[in-house]
Every structure is written in structure tokens, then in C-alpha cells.
Design a protein with these regions (language model features):
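Polar/acidic, low-complexity leader/linker segments enriched in S/T/G and N/D
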Residues: 1-45
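Oligomerization/assembly interface segments of phage tail-like spikes and tubes
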Residues: 51-76, 122-135, 276
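Solvent-exposed loop and beta-edge segments used for protein-protein assembly and interaction
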Residues: 60-64, 89-91, 102, 120-124, ...
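Long, hydrophobic/aromatic-enriched structural stretches that serve as scaffold segments
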Residues: 62-111
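Beta-strand elements of well-folded, non-transmembrane domains
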Residues: 70-74, 101, 114, 132-136, ...
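Short beta-strand and beta-hairpin "edge-sheet" elements
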Residues: 94-139
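Short, charged, solvent-exposed linker or helix-capping segments at domain edges/interfaces
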Residues: 138-146
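Intrinsically disordered, low-complexity segments enriched in serine, threonine, and glycine
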Residues: 145-302
């Protein structure tokens, strides 16, 4: 069951509308919402002259159309409530919709297509049409998977038997080159891979063990572009999200596009439902790498 909808306009102004309850400040009451299920798909096929039926070619999801019906209450007047709908649902502007249900919190982004109030009705209300060019809903929080961990080992009381040798141990860093991302979403999604170097590294290779996909970073190309390969302090961010694919290097506060340093046959990883096992290696300096993978959960409907 849907509990509430939080609307945030392009100016960052927001209002949270609980289903079945009049929001006292805005005077808005949700009576109906359409378009929250899976979006309609286009299935592209080709007719065969000599065979029955068609041959499947491809498929894609259409844009999503969410229609919200609002009833106006006293805030302090009906006119104020109607004008608040213009404020929170500005025509042609982008807004964020955050849906809270019994077992899911997700968000979608869209543009207000129309706001059509019935001004002269005894029960004044409006229908607001929102076009979501991205038909999916996304989790609010990101899943973060670390390939390293830090274990504190310093304890009180402590003893230092030497003033010359470093005998005190403050902590241990544990590195793992293989970890599993468990994905629970309805549709495939990309990931963001963050690589932090604490020392020199040569030629990094990342694997998706389940799909046999490979992504390689050629440090010789990186050296040609920047003067160095991967060195201590470097941060490399790889995004495999559709529509946002990128590879950037952050070095000494300067952000550089290094997508040309990827192998030409590189695969752009996508998470499938269930276990997704990732592994990384390097020709030299793999112990100098700290990996982190983040992803959002993608839902087909609320």
C-alpha cells in the first residue's frame, strides 16, 4: 500500500502528501494516482513471408505518464490550495516524486505536462500529468560494496619496547580482489566503480565472473595522456550506467576524462538479479588498489 508521496519542485521546495489525509499547509489531498505500474513496452518484430508469426527483433520501454488527482481543501482558502498546486507542480518544469510504500521507498523524475484544475466545480480538484522520460523508479539509497576493510588493533594499556623500531600497530587493512554484489532490482542497471591507488599500479583488469565480461585500463595510454600511469593518490571513477557511461581520473584536484584509456573491447557491466561476482587484477601493484562498487536498485513499478 502506498503511504505517501513527497513532491520536490525544481527550486527544491517540497511537500509530503499522505494518501487519504489533507496536507494542512498546502491544502492538497491526493484522491488517485495513475501510471505507477510497469511502463508499456514496444516489441519490434519482422513478418516472415513463408513462416507463421513474426521474428523478434528488439524491445524497449516507453516513457512513463503519471497522473495525480488532487482535491483542494482550505489552506486557508480553496484559491490558496489551487495556487499551491501551481507552486509544487510548475508547468514544464522538472520535479522529483518520492513514493513510500509498506516495503519500498523509491523515486522518479519527470516533467509537468499539464495542471488542469476544475475551478467551477462544487468539489474543486485538478489532474496533474507528469511525463517521466526515464520509465524506471530508483531506490533512494545506494548499495556500497567495499573490496577492503580496516581492522583497529591498538589497545590500552600498550607497551613500546623500542624508541627506534615501529613496534606499535594501529590497525590492519584487509584487501579482497573478489566480491559479490547481490542485486534485488526488477531491471538491469549499471554500477559506479571507484578505484583509489595508494601506490603505483600497472594495467588494471576488472572481471564480471558470471558473464565473462572484461574491462581493462591501459596505463601506458594513461601515461601518454597525463605523463604518469596510475600513481599514489589517484582516484579513478568508472560509471557503466546507461546514458551516464564515463571514466574519469582525479589527480591533484584535477578531473580528467580518460575513457580512451579503456580497452576498445571493454564491456560495460550491468547488474542482473541475484549474485554478480566481480574480480580485479593488475600486472603490478594490485595490493595498492582499493576498490568500491556502488549501485542503485531499479524498479519497474511502485
Amino acid at each position: 500500500m502506498i503511504k505517501s508521496v513527497k513532491v520536490t519542485n525544481y527550486l527544491g521546495e517540497s511537500v509530503q502528501l499522505r494518501l487519504g489525509e489533507l496536507e494542512p499547509k498546502s491544502g492538497l489531498l491526493i484522491t488517485n494516482i495513475e501510471g505507477l505500474g510497469p511502463a508499456k513496452a514496444n516489441i519490434n518484430t519482422t513478418e516472415m513471408a513463408t513462416n507463421d508469426g513474426d521474428v523478434y527483433n528488439s524491445s524497449r520501454l516507453q516513457k512513463r505518464n503519471i497522473v495525480i488527482t488532487l482535491r483542494f481543501g482550505w489552506a486557508p482558502t480553496i484559491e490558496d490550495a489551487r495556487q499551491n498546486s501551481y507552486k509544487y507542480f510548475p508547468i514544464k518544469r522538472r520535479l522529483e516524486l518520492l513514493f513510500e510504500t509498506d516495503n519500498r521507498v523509491c523515486k522518479a523524475y519527470g516533467y509537468v505536462e499539464s495542471n488542469e484544475p476544475n475551478i467551477f466545480s462544487d468539489e474543486s480538484e485538478t489532474k496533474i500529468s507528469i511525463i517521466c522520460v526515464d520509465p524506471y523508479f530508483y531506490s533512494v539509497d545506494e548499495n556500497v560494496l567495499l573490496f577492503y576493510s580496516m581492522e583497529p588493533t591498538f589497545e590500552f594499556p600498550f607497551e613500546n619496547d623500542s624508541l627506534e623500531e615501529p613496534l606499535l600497530e594501529m590497525g590492519n587493512i584487509w584487501l579482497k580482489t573478489e566480491r559479490t554484489v547481490y542485486y534485488t532490482g526488477d531491471a538491469e542497471t549499471g554500477v559506479v566503480i571507484n578505484i583509489h591507488a595508494v601506490g603505483p599500479v600497472r594495467n588494471v583488469t576488472i572481471y564480471n565472473m558470471g558473464t565473462r565480461e572484461v574491462m581493462k585500463i591501459d596505463t601506458s595510454r594513461l601515461e601518454e595522456m597525463t605523463g604518469y600511469g596510475i600513481i599514489a593518490g589517484d582516484d579513478i571513477t568508472i560509471s557503466t550506467i546507461r546514458g551516464k557511461k564515463s571514466v574519469y581520473l582525479l589527480r591533484n584536484g584535477v578531473k580528467t576524462n580518460i575513457i580512451n584509456c579503456l580497452d576498445k573491447q571493454a564491456d560495460w557491466f550491468q547488474l542482473a538479479k541475484g549474485d554478480n561476482v566481480f574480480n580485479y587484477t593488475a600486472e603490478y601493484g594490485s595490493v595498492n588498489l582499493q576498490f568500491r562498487i556502488t549501485n542503485q536498485i531499479v524498479y519497474e513499478g511502485v
